[in-house]
Amino acid sequence: MLHGFTGSPASFAALTPPRLALAPPLAGHAAVPASAHFWAEVERLGALVPDANKLFGYSLGARLSLGLLARYPRRFDQAVLVSAHPGLRTDRQRDLRRTEDDRYIRLLRERGLPEFVAVWEAQGMWRSQDALPATVRADKHRERLTHTAEGLARCLASVGLGQMPDLRAQLAQSVCSVEFLVGGQDRKFLEAAQELCAIMPRARLHVAENHGHDLVLECPQFCSTFLARGPSS
């Protein structure tokens, strides 16, 4: 089970995970050093649980899960991926994204973690969380503050979306059963999931209407339902 950027294994506390599920912190989070690049982090995660055959990932964790499916095309039987992205298509798009991420990296290094978190949480992609109880939002805020500014900066610099290769060609060859979960209000990631379902032979799309990007936080029962299921045919 792979968490999102600024998250942690605690992000999954409200889910009902399978027995013996492992949820490692990702590179740059907690005390885990940042990996040199996207594939290095994929290979680090693959080595942690060489016998695992099921993946659950959210956002950054979903992107890394797609990397695992691409790197080890016959290893996994099933994946449940929330708000996944297969990577940007062109060098130009990746350059633009790296420029955007560089602003966050400078903010982390020059202004510190609390100011970065305030800016990060002000993004429109989290607006659907306004309806959540204040205690839930406060817990998420505290979780983000458990990291270090340098750790998150190095995470963005190594496995941010601008550092991720385009995985579409490799994923089109995947034999894994994949359930893509996405919020109906999260248009960018809904389009990405629709595209992935069109190219991956055993992929299915499930939309949580009236919800946004972080379905793990907003509707954990929806996510748990798919965690409990076996692979689709």
Where are these regions (language model features)?
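Gly/Ala-rich beta-loop-alpha elbow adjacent to hydrolase catalytic centers
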Residues: 57-61, 65
